[in-house]
Amino acid sequence: MKSLTTPHLNSANVFNPDAGVQQSEDRISNNAWLYDPDRYPIISGVPQPPEQAHLYRVINKRLEDCTGLNGVGTEGFQVNNYGIGGHYLWHYDSLYYNDKSGTYKNDRLATWMFYLNDVVEGGNTVFTRLNIAIPPMKGAAVFWYNLHPSGLNDFRTLHAGCPILQGTKWVTNLWIGEFEQIFHKPCLKGADRETSSPHDIINYYEALLASM
């Protein structure tokens, strides 16, 4: 993945609900994408290399086997490289929470993230409301759901990538679409029970952590 994406790395962007996609000091990294070869066999007028297409299919199939979710319709693998001082401040992976249009979109139901190298110092992935810090280890993966069964944002998933103090960090993200899971993870009976406001939910979990 590193060798395939290194020639295509560019400064990473973030989604700003007021200004759209833009560069931000909240996220200091470079990234590139590997796209589904069955949906995008040609990128910028060039056919995807066979080894790249094979790698995508193999890893995507492994993800489906591990999670039981449908990998079709994902955004592709986003490969990120963080240098010294590189970081990603607190954010949610779900997009509906950040979208002020009021239109329900195909949101990021879940995130699959895996580390492509060991980091000398720094670079932990931190979920502050869950009191969890995950050190980057080559070959390790992290998986979590961004949404409740009802489709509402799970505010416990606020997370960040800590600054790199020594070395560099390579990490790959794959966001799994919600709409494609209708026959794999349908809404459950009583799934709309998460009816509290975002602030109520945040206050609840912060109080819970403070009591630990």
Residue ranges of predicted features:
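Fe(II)/2-oxoglutarate oxygenase catalytic core
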Residues: 1-143, 147-212
